[in-house]
A protein has these predicted regions:
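Glycine-rich beta-strand-to-loop/alpha-helix junction loops that act as flexible
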Residues: 171-173, 202-211, 240-242
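Acidic/histidine-enriched ion/cofactor-binding microenvironments in catalytic or ligand-binding pockets
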Residues: 190, 195-199, 219-226, 230-231, ...
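N-terminal capping/small domains of soluble enzymes
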Residues: 1-76, 272, 320-333, 337-339
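Short glycine/threonine-rich loop-to-helix capping motif typified by GTGT followed
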Residues: 178-183, 211-220, 247-253, 257, ...
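Charged (often Lys/Glu-rich) extended helix/loop segments that serve as interaction or gating elements
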Residues: 238-379
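Active-site-proximal beta-alpha core segment in soluble small-molecule metabolic enzymes
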Residues: 35-201, 215, 223-226
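Feature marks short, surface-exposed loop/turn motifs that line or immediately flank catalytic pockets
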Residues: 133-135, 174, 210, 244, ...
């Protein structure tokens, strides 16, 4: 049990034991299925925890030059890099930090592949393909929506791939099940398997939430084993993000005031949904609050409000078993993925600290933010 008194407030706190539990499961899937599973930095990049990850996995995936550099310098291995578009300015550094580079279009491949050849370090290049199939319901997160900017459809690929394309990358999941992957593979193979003899690797992207309690990992392993049996020469790669740190930590906050308007009580916190939990408003993703239930049934009902000037910076209603008090701790569950990587300093609101609760039961504070962090971003 975390001793919250050892941490500043607000604070993102990851539990090492829960992280290791997820890492063990993911390594078991990879070993049994004969595939490689790598960490996607877009969901989680708390680099001080990378030594723990390196006990279980070898590589990571990047979507930008900064993520690629983080992979090389902090994770300790070159990145599998994909970006919707590379620039002349960034590409030399992308090459320095990457073992694999996936291009989003043939134009980008034709523009930058000569630089890869000239660089001469053996970078493996691929192209992102669009199977035109995804079961992601939230349009904001659907990479295969009509008119998407991501990937090449089968009708636009030449019969013979250009020299230098060694892999396909396909990403069309978001917190998905193995059964969604099964249906995706049917579409992917129907549209693109005729090119499989020409490539060396197939990256199935992220969104495979294999650490969720109801996820059928045995079915996933069987699926991947079957895919490898059908295409034994292909190296299969998965790059989930959330799965690695699913349910591994919290965001702690405190009540700083309680206001009431038209019968609605709002507990104003020292955190912000728009600044520190943006998916709650964008997705929208419904967070869980420790010791509270969603809904307006009960004696002590509160809306939870963020401490910014955005009118919509609130969530709720929540039912508590007692009246909230100023200074009381409010704990948001499962707030390690897609939070720290997406936070901002809107309004100059104090940014939560970043910390870990070690398996030995000790608090390690990785980062505390200050006025200088805010000032340094502004100019």
């Amino acid at each position: 049990m975390i001793d919250f008194n050892q941490f500043p407030s607000p604070c993102y706190i990851m539990e090492e034991e829960l992280l290791r539990k997820n890492l063990c499961l993911i390594k078991n899937v990879a070993d049994r299925a004969g595939v490689e599973i790598i960490l996607a930095f877009k969901s989680f990049a708390m680099w001080r925890s990378f030594p723990i990850f390196r006990e279980y996995i070898d590589h990571s995936t990047a979507s930008s030059v900064y993520e690629a550099r983080l992979a090389l310098e902090e994770f300790g291995s070159k990145a599998h890099t994909y970006s919707p578009a590379y620039t002349e300015q960034d590409f030399p550094e992308i090459m320095r930090c990457s073992s694999h580079i996936t291009f989003n279009s043939m134009q980008q491949f034709e523009r930058f592949y000569p630089m890869v050849v000239a660089e001469g370090s053996g970078i493996s290049c691929g192209i992102r393909v669009n199977p035109e199939y995804s079961e992601v319901e939230t349009e904001l997160y659907n990479p295969c929506a009509p008119g998407t900017r991501f990937g090449i459809t089968a009708d636009l690929l030449p019969d013979v791939l250009p020299q230098g394309i060694e892999g396909f990358h396909c990403h069309c999941h978001c917190e998905s099940s193995s059964y969604e992957l099964e249906r995706t593979l049917e579409h992917l193979e129907a549209k693109f398997s005729r090119w499989f003899p020409q490539i060396k690797w197939l990256n199935l992207g992220g969104g495979h939430l294999m650490t969720r309690k109801d996820y059928d990992t045995e079915h996933l392993i069987t699926l991947l084993q079957g895919l490898k049996a059908r295409h034994p020469h292909l190296r299969i790669i998965l790059e989930p993000g959330s799965a690695f740190i699913w349910q591994t930590g919290v965001l702690t906050s405190e009540v700083v005031d309680i206001v009431e308007s038209r019968g609605i009580k709002t507990a104003i916190l020292n955190v912000s949904f728009t600044c520190h939990m943006p998916d709650c408003l964008e997705m929208p993703y419904q967070p869980a609050v420790r010791g509270a239930e969603m809904g307006n049934e009960g004696k002590y009902i509160y809306r939870l409000g963020g401490n910014s000037c955005l009118s919509g910076d609130y969530m709720g209603l929540w039912s508590f078993d007692h009246p909230l008090q100023i200074g009381e701790r409010i704990v948001f569950e499962d707030m390690i993925h897609y939070t720290m990587v997406k936070t901002n300093m809107f309004n100059g609101i104090h940014h939560p600290a970043i910390a870990i609760w070690t398996k030995e039961g000790k608090a390690e504070i990785y980062k505390q933010f200050s006025y200088e962090d805010y000032r340094g971003r502004m100019s």
